[in-house]
């Protein structure tokens, strides 16, 4: 009862145009909206129909934009179960659809700021969380050159933000806020282990 599918057809000179609209009642307690990343993690690509079948969803839409020539991770902000899992890229005019805890829908722009603090107290800014490489629209700079990025175990790929412009990055494995391993000369050649983070730096 909380989801109604409506189909529309418009006749035009060259034929007709069809549109399917799903009307959702956010006040219905039996309705739940979720974010579904690919086959379960970022970079693990899947079609919309495959994701719907895997999760038994009654409907699904492609809710973000992706650089399919890169790792296929979302460009925009992603929040799952109230936790930020993908930060906003430094691009202009990118809006996000969100649902608040009281089930109110909104559309707005987001920004991201983050930092890491070393044991000696030194602080460095983070440029992104679970982001593939891109060119920043505001500065024209490469997103990963001379920057720090953080990757969680939701990032399914063995490479993080790498393209031909990036040099030889170094990576730090973190678990429970403790450094467990360091990899120079290109970083770790594996996905992020469950319960861990990888801090990726270049330059």
PLM regions: where:
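Gly/Ser/Thr/Pro-rich low-complexity, intrinsically disordered segments
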Residues: 1-203
């Amino acid at each position: 009862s909380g989801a109604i599918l409506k189909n529309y057809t418009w006749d035009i000179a060259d034929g007709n145009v069809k549109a399917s609209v799903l009307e959702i009642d956010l006040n219905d307690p039996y309705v739940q909206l979720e974010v579904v990343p690919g086959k379960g993690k970022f970079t693990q690509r899947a079609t919309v129909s495959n994701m719907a079948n895997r999760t038994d969803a009654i409907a699904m839409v492609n809710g973000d934009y992706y650089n399919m020539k890169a790792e296929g991770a979302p460009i925009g902000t992603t929040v799952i179960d109230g936790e930020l899992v993908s930060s906003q890229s430094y691009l202009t005019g990118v809006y996000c659809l969100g649902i608040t805890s009281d089930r109110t829908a909104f559309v707005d722009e987001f920004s991201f700021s983050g930092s890491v603090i070393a044991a000696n107290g030194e602080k460095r800014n983070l440029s992104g969380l679970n982001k593939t490489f891109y060119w920043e629209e505001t500065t024209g700079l490469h997103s990963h050159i001379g920057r720090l990025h953080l990757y969680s175990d939701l990032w399914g790929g063995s490479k993080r933000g790498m393209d031909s412009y990036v040099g030889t990055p170094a990576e730090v494995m973190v678990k429970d806020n403790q450094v467990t391993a360091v990899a120079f000369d290109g970083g770790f050649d594996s996905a992020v282990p469950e319960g861990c983070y990888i801090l990726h730096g270049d330059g």
